[in-house]
Amino acid sequence: MPIYVLEPPARYNHAYAGTVIERVLPLREARQACAKRGVHADACSWESGHSCVLIIPRGGPVKNLQAYIRHERAHCNGWSENHSE
């Protein structure tokens, strides 16, 4: 079974208009941080004021951290959590 991070649609795959706060954590800590927000995943994101907070796993199943960053930043840019267009 291939392991990958879903690429966001082009219209959400761009720089965030505010401040981006990026936390790269060991996989276990990233999962715990996301679980505290009700997200059961390796990575997550949320908006806080004019900031986009990204929780990115280090040592996770996908080694390309930029793939996680693109995916999670897209959620701050309006991509729905169910990944619909």
PLM features: what roles do these ranges have?
Residues 1-22:
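N-terminal low-complexity, Pro/Thr/Ser-rich intrinsically disordered segments
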Residues 11-15, 24-51, 63:
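Catalytic zinc-binding patch centered on the HExxH motif and its immediate surroundings
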Residues 50-70, 80-84:
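Short pre-active-site segment immediately N-terminal to the catalytic Zn-binding motif
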Residues 74, 78:
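Short active-site segment of divalent metal-dependent hydrolases/proteases
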